[in-house]
Amino acid sequence: MILGRTISLFLGCSALVSGALIEHHAASSTDQPVDVPYNLDMFSQAAVLAQETYCGEQAHDYGLKLGDATLLWTAGDGNVRQRVNLYQSDSLGIAVAIQGTNTSSLRSDLHDAQLRPVDPDSRYRRFLPQGTKVMNGFQKGYTDLVDDIFDHVKKFKQEKNESRVTVIGHSLGAAIGLLASLDINLRLEDGLFKSYLFGLPRVGNPIFANFVDRKIGDKLHWVVNGRDWVPTVPPRALGYQHPSNYVWIYPANSTNWKLYPGQENVHGMLTVAREFNFDDHEGIYFHTQIGASLGKCPAVLGGY
């Protein structure tokens, strides 16, 4: 726990700021922010499902209703494996929500601390461009879950006669969720419907980020709250890069949100000093609070 946070804080302080060339549909990293062109209610619905992954007491309360979603299945205990919840949602389809860091679990913390860029896992490597690298710890978190996720998503798609699959995550769960979003789009019939990722760290190198833009750029919605430092790590100095088009809520926990085009937009989150605590990271995203320590259990949709 201490090791993971210490390394992450140090690397956050050393993060570099610069623009980057991006794929055609992703706009330019020097473009000015624009109004968020998405359905904001879907962000709120996704946020409450992200929060519920931190709620161990309701982990197997199948049938639990959260907004328009019903809990179908759960795996992982947040210690050996990150918790993943599957829901049936009117707006999101089969929703896959992945837990963020459990700071009381050394294994969970180590997922955040294993910073080495590595080749993609053999299950999906052939679908990605040569030279793709992803962070070792995040990929380990995903490969602990991937087979269970695929088996149960296929099962519930058939049972519920549902073609849409949405991936949701916060923090470490967002990093794992980005890998899951791309993998589902590449290997699962009907692909990805939407992805909602809150407090997303950098996951892969520029080749990975460009491929994400090409394959799921129009389906990916990721959000930064205020001065949250987590999205600034791992640093670009280690070869990591974000995909395009994030939503920045600034000031934190407010309703002032804009979409920042391109990769590593020069007008966005990197223009303000980071606050190296978890207040903004575990903040209010589209009227719903997400966080292992600050969020409510059972999760509550809206209210802020």
Swiss-Prot record:
Temperature and thermostability: Optimum temperature is 15 degrees Celsius.
Its cellular-component GO annotations read: extracellular region
Q: How does activity depend on pH?
A: Optimum pH is 6,0.
Is Glycosyltransferase set as a keyword in this record? no
The record's EC number reads 3.1.1.-
What glycosylation sites does the entry record? N102, N161, N253
Database matches in Pfam families: Lipase_3
| Protein's UniProt keywords contain Cell wall biogenesis/degradation | no
Per UniProt, subcellular location reads as: Secreted; Secreted, Cell wall
The identity of this protein, by name, is: Secreted mono- and diacylglycerol lipase MDL2
Q: Which organism is it from?
A: Malassezia globosa (strain ATCC MYA-4612 / CBS 7966)
